[in-house]
């Protein structure tokens, strides 16, 4: 809320602060690559519906800075995941992220209050998608059978296409480890089933 307020009233000061953050992140990325990191999980936020109250918010205060950091992440690395984070709010459209770098896309399970499938993600971004599990769904509060069913159903809807199983965002800290183990075990088992 405070960030949006300052973006309206003090846009030049906000841009100056973002410039400092961007330079620091680029320095961090370079240091990581220097010690051997060969890929990054690059998250973005700021395109959520709640930011529409500030005209041009995404184009002015998010994308230019994101792109600079993500381009550095994608220079001389082999594998990078673009994560479109909906932890702070919903999206009504993801097309503004299509030009973002990253070999794999991890997007929300819901866009414009509608399910957003891995197939839809691959079709929009023309790159492989990672996800399929809603972080607040079966992985968080379901039984082993419910988790397994969700993964088997996902595989069935993909009709033999390869996919990278994951959550739509960071799984919550209270997610039971047994549920995570069930998801891993089930995903390994589904690899051997046509």
Predicted regions span which residues?
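Active-site loop segments of alpha/beta catalytic cores
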Residues: 1-194
